[in-house]
Amino acid sequence: MGRLTEAAAAGGGASAARSAGPPPAPLPLSSTSPGCAAAMASSEEDGTNGGASEASDEREAVGKRRRLGLLATIWLTFYNIAMTAGWLVLAIAMVRFYMEKGTHKGLYKSIQKTLKFFQTFALLEIVHCLIGIVPTSVLVAGVQVSSRIFMVWLVTHSIKPIQNEESVVLFLVAWTVTEITRYSFYTFSLLDHLPYFIKWARYNFFIILYPVGVAGELLTIYAALPYVKKTGMFSIRLPNKYNVSFDYYYFLLITMASYIPLFPQLYFHMLRQRRKVLHGEVIVEKDD
């Protein structure tokens, strides 16, 4: 038997109500655990809270927004404007650095403080879910946000020899364009004035940005493996008084392997969401 899934409306729907909330997606997204950007993108890039809630039309989105209350809407609007501005600052800083230096080497070091601040600031998205001003599940939000923080703090920040890798530039560019698009989409949706270009960008840019971001993250983690194996960083060896062991090297390998099943599944899910939002298609999904 098939299951009919009605198309989401073009007005932003659940994404607008979720506004300050995560991720997916992505993943993507993005940088998720266990698959870094993969799990994140599932709700961030497709704008559907990982499929948890989809609006059937713009009136439903407006109704949800009213239920948030005036103060919550004001705060979410401010939050999304701030995050849009923050990622715009990062974009400008990256362009200026490359124009002045003519190389990517040293780029991460030059923008790391701003990157860490705004990516860590996204922890508020978990709080938004906890207090109920966005409809995303706390678990989904937690995975999405913590995965990005994992990539920033526990990989790129902690393993300095990899900071000049070209792969770092790949995921930084993908993240930056994605977040500018995502947060501006949420902002305009909350203001009930969503330009078509922003909606179009939201549901088209991921086609390139998601694979680029995932590739950048995978290559960065891969580049970190020799250093992690040599130094044993973040690993816990036996014997110890807690009788517990942990090998960060193998943890990173498992993280990389998790992309194999997650990436295709989530990417095609996002493509289906794109067809629903931009073309109003009714998708028939077969139940096995």
UniProtKB/Swiss-Prot annotation:
Carbohydrate-modified residues: 243
Disordered, as annotated region: 1-59
EC category: lyase
EC numbers on record: 4.2.1.134
Topology, Lumenal side: 96-114, 160-165, 222-251
Family affiliation: Belongs to the very long-chain fatty acids dehydratase HACD family.
Protein name (Swiss-Prot/TrEMBL): Very-long-chain (3R)-3-hydroxyacyl-CoA dehydratase 1
Organism: Ovis aries (Sheep)
Lineage of the organism: Eukaryota, Metazoa, Chordata, Craniata, Vertebrata
Gene assigned in the entry: HACD1
